[in-house]
């Protein structure tokens, strides 16, 4: 049983290490515009992907505890690193509240989309090092070939707002050269920061490679889960997200405006 009573009006809690989870917020808002969203970006401790597993699991517990104070009906882990290394910690801390991780949703979508059976995955050092994407993809279909590549500089570039910048293009060209000759037809953006850089990534990979953004898959999964439990918010009003960060709220506002293309309500600064 959940730790608290939930209703259709209860919020969806979403967390990530920084601004990357806004890609999930955007997808959930598009799919489920009436839902109230509580978002936490751990901007004081970003990036998670270069931390140890012990530290990542500690952060995952603390982030979930923060969201649980808002009595959510669903928690979305908008961080592939946590999805890969600490989803069990989130589930334990959530105490019966359903949890959706971006990693499994992205893996399932990649399996659906590939025609050649050759899938590339880019992610943080921790996510790629965990082998979680390869395992999740082969769990769906064991004959598929998976080519992983760690891209550790993408998160800091996104956090700096270098969305369409020559430095980002140079780094992306270096990383994506790893797929030359691999004949992949599908590329998983295995970090929620990476869709922020999607325009540059797509310009390098070309139109013949299908880009998998797990944010859209997660939003679809969230809608299905809430509908099955009778917890969809039926309000005709569009809800604005409640945004929390652990550092630099003004910078977060600027990046939110840049990425989401809209003004936003106040950003709450919380201590961790």
From Swiss-Prot:
Entry similarity comment: Belongs to the aspartate/glutamate racemases family.
Function statement: Provides the (R)-glutamate required for cell wall biosynthesis.
Example GO BP: peptidoglycan biosynthetic process
The protein, known as: Glutamate racemase
Organism in which the protein naturally occurs: Chlorobaculum tepidum (strain ATCC 49652 / DSM 12025 / NBRC 103806 / TLS)
Reactions accelerated catalytically: L-glutamate = D-glutamate
Residues given in the record as substrate binding sites: 16-17, 48-49, 80-81, 192-193
Catalytic site: 79, 191
Annotated gene: murI
Pathway per the UniProt entry: Cell wall biogenesis; peptidoglycan biosynthesis
Keywords, in A-Z order: Cell shape, Cell wall biogenesis/degradation, Isomerase, Peptidoglycan synthesis
InterPro entries on file: Asp/Glu/hydantoin_racemase (IPR015942), Asp/Glu_race (IPR001920), Asp/Glu_racemase_AS_2 (IPR033134), Glu_race (IPR004391)
PROSITE patterns in the cross-refs: ASP_GLU_RACEMASE_2
Domain of life: Bacteria
E.C. code: 5.1.1.3
TM region(s), chain numbering: none
Molecular function as annotated in GO: glutamate racemase activity
């Amino acid at each position: 049983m959940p730790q608290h009573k939930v209703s259709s009006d209860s919020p969806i809690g979403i967390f990530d290490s920084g601004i990357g989870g806004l890609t999930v917020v955007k997808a959930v808002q598009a799919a489920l515009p009436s839902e109230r969203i509580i978002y936490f970006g751990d901007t004081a401790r970003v990036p998670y992907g270069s931390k140890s597993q012990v530290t990542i699991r500690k952060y995952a517990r603390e982030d979930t505890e923060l969201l649980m104070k808002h009595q959510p009906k669903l928690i979305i882990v908008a961080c592939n690193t946590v999805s890969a290394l600490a989803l069990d910690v989130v589930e334990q801390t959530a105490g019966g509240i359903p949890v959706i991780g971006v990693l499994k949703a992205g893996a399932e979508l990649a399996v659906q989309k590939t025609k050649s059976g050759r899938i590339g995955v880019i992610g943080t050092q921790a996510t790629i090092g965990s082998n979680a994407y390869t395992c999740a993809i082969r769990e769906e279909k064991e004959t598929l070939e998976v080519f992983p590549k760690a891209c550790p500089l993408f998160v800091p570039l996104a956090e700096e707002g270098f969305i369409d910048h020559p430095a980002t293009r140079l780094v992306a060209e270096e990383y994506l050269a790893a797929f030359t000759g691999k004949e992949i037809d599908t590329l998983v953006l295995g970090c929620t920061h990476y869709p922020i850089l999607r325009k540059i990534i797509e310009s390098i990979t070309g139109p013949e490679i299908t880009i998998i953004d797990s944010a859209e898959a997660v939003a679809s999964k969230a809608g299905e889960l809430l509908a099955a439990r009778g917890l969809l918010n039926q309000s005709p009003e569009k809800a604005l997200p409640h945004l929390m960060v652990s550092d630099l709220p003004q910078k977060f506002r600027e990046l939110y405006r840049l990425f989401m293309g809209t003004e936003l309500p106040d950003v709450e600064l919380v201590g961790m």
